[in-house]
Amino acid sequence: MNIQEFKQKYNYDVATKMMQQYLDIKFAHLDCLLLFRMGDFYEMFYDDAILASNVLGIALTKRGKNGEEEIAMCGVPYHALEHYLTKLIEANYKVAICDQLETPEDAKNRGGYKAVVTRDVTRIITPGTIIEENLIASAEPNYLASLVIPQNKETASICYVDLSTSEIFVVNVPEAEILNELARLKPREILVSENLRSSNLADSIFKQLNFRITYQVDSCFAINKCKKIILDFYKMKDIKGIGEISSSQICVIGSILEYLSLTQKQNIPHLPIPRIINFHSYMTIDFSTRHNLAIVINSQGSSNGSLLNTINHTVTKQGGRLLYNFLSSPLTNIAKINHRLNITEFFYSNLEIVQRIRELLKKTSDIERCLTRITMNRSSGCDLLSIKYTLEAATIIKGVFFDAYGFNLPDFIEKIIKPLAGDAELYHLIDESIRADVPNNLNDGGIIKHEYHPKVAQLHDLINNRKLHIEKLKDQYRKETGIDSLKISHNNVIGLFIDITAKNVNKILDPKFIHRQTTVNNVRYTTTELQKLESELVNAKTLVISLEKALYADICSQVIKKAAYLRMLASSLSVLDVFCNFAYIADEYDYVKPELTDDLSFDIVKGRHPVVEKVLQRESKSFVYNDCHLSELKRIWLITGPNMAGKSTFLRQNAIIAIIAQIGSFVPAKSAKIGVVDKIFSRIGAADDLIKGQSTFMAEMLETSAILAQSTKNSLIILDEVGRGTSTYDGVSIAWSVLEYIHDKLKCRCLFATHYHELTVMNNFLPALQNYTIAIEESGKDILFLHNIISGAADRSYGIHVAALAGLPASVINRAEQILLKFEKTSTGKGKNILSTESNNLRLFNLEHNQTTIRSKLEEQFRTIDPDQLSPKAALELIYELKKLA
């Protein structure tokens, strides 16, 4: 919509000046909900009002007419803005905050009584650019991402920034891994070029990952423009100052900096030079696997019942975020993993220190986000106090280490706690200047201690002792004049005045007493001294707030100079919190230090599922542990057994153990030896993807296809019931061929659970495959699931027993047992069908032999063909011959 169409739609020419001002600002922010400050309210008009009233659950009213059209309106109190912003941001809306830049009095002085108060947008709030503590989750990052896919489409670039903590990163990602990387980052908002709007990728980001996409015009990603933005922002002369970065990385960094500048109205915190991330330095976990394993959120989108929720006993917000990042990005470098494990082991061996540190960490604050608010002029005195208390606690924490170890700490611990020495100068600055009972709002005053600045003390003295100052002056004038009845009074016409009776006029001899007014019985005077006192009393509140703001800004500027140190301190405290947390859960839940190797070992003794175990503990039940022994020679376990017996739990627990080990934590097992896993893939559960119009089976096949395409020799695959969404013969055939492919081509570690007992014969010709099943006890018709994984193969699934447990009518259960008995009698053996009896002699349909024969005949035929000598008729005949060979 162009400006002419916009003005015509909203009857601009007949609108009031105030409404014209609103429309001018709205046209410049058509992609936003515009909150327009009017006195004590933020108002919304027209379509914005209709939409916001529904989202916020507030009344929709009208504000007169614009021409013949009634103007829809709704509003929220300015002091409750954050409450309503939370709802709008959670609903994925972009919000422009339009503030009054002057008071109504200023407007009158500028342009008379008809002047409209000057207003403009001071900030645009989007899901990816929030910094307010009440609007964002404290225990996870709040990323804004920018994505560029170069024309060659081989490698994409992603830049991601957490504005609330002033962290920025850039990574190159293979095109096939874009969705996996975005699933790892879980950004609140993604910037992409307009030319991707109709792409399959954008569709997948929105529908599969449910992330907000903000489309930007293509020019926002132009390399020359982005390069200039970067150089200007970091005050550099050469782009090499960023490091060795690709053209697409320049584009994503530049585009994200420009977006921050536009939304924050140039008020961007200092961002460090982007940290270049190596995509291969952490484990790849695709979106489906993250969902299936409930790593950071459960299937309902909540953290309850997730792995993160189970092992997160951190005591600080920044520690919680670091643990979130650890879990989202397990390492793949053995040296780095072992470094983390050594730190965990140190704290596990010093649990008394851990207990003391955790108590002290509770006294620290989220100074990363405090510092960002300070640098963006959106802080309160509470942020400064948070820094002060954190500095104090940090110094004590360092003392705890010194008391226990003196100067004999391991180097890797010494490096972590080095920033804890504190900054005495900064601590004393805040301690001496900021009141302990500081209000949240700077406009309320009462931030600065009276003794910090003499003028502050003087003004507060005036405010708090108004009557005393007037009484003091009254006593002085009584002595000077000898008039004992002299009073100092006040009215709204002449303000403060000296009041004497008419008979005492002849005693007023000093010319400093200036006549103001005579009444029937009294005469009123003033003095320069009294006028000054009155002016000070009238202006004291305004003056003290103004002075306190200036002093506060100066103190903040001193804090900003220490930003680099404070960020190091925040990092140190978060690292301490995470590793003390690892030691705590290792002790609390009996976890063990894993051994990491560079082979295909996966040797878990008495492994447990941490989430399920915790749930059972609350119910006073015990978790049944299980072993898992995979190696290069025996790398596939084919697991059969009844439903509800624990197959899926076993699959998940081993994937989770690998993840926990590679973040540097001890693991829930008696012992664990794990060859580093580069990628984990899972195919568990069944659900129709109704949004995409995909059936359960299609969704399953797409996931399985992606797993087979992306896995490497060092990957860990867990598959549950592949092929169950179609007919039995189709399902068995697919499951069989998938197992063959994993065994022969990928040669990676795999746990494969199935109800297709026909597959259990595959160990006869797949040497790396072993059969395992779930132990049960049968007593007549009663069955007890023991949940133990044992060597061997199941010959039935006990599905009817599970159906009975689910409460199906007895008549249905009895009939099902009759039908099952008939099927078993007509089969070639209990629990087997024709596929399994024939499979000892051939790998399913002898595909490999047939394919080789066909291929050799086709190759021989192709060698005899000379394309340049073929006529159209001969070419057609040749096609028919080739078809016969196939």
UniProtKB/Swiss-Prot annotation:
ATP binds at residues 641-648. The keyword DNA repair applies. Keywords: ATP-binding, DNA damage, DNA repair, DNA-binding, Nucleotide-binding. The keyword DNA repair applies. InterPro entries: DNA_mismatch_repair_MutS (IPR005748), DNA_mismatch_repair_MutS-lik_N (IPR007695), DNA_mismatch_repair_MutS/MSH (IPR017261), DNA_mismatch_repair_MutS_C (IPR000432), DNA_mismatch_repair_MutS_clamp (IPR007861), DNA_mismatch_repair_MutS_core (IPR007696), DNA_mismatch_repair_MutS_N (IPR016151), DNA_mismatch_repair_MutS_sf (IPR036187). It comes from the Bacteria. CDD domains: ABC_MutS1 (cd03284). This protein is involved in the repair of mismatches in DNA. It is possible that it carries out the mismatch recognition step. This protein has a weak ATPase activity. Belongs to the DNA mismatch repair MutS family. This is DNA mismatch repair protein MutS. It comes from Rickettsia akari (strain Hartford).
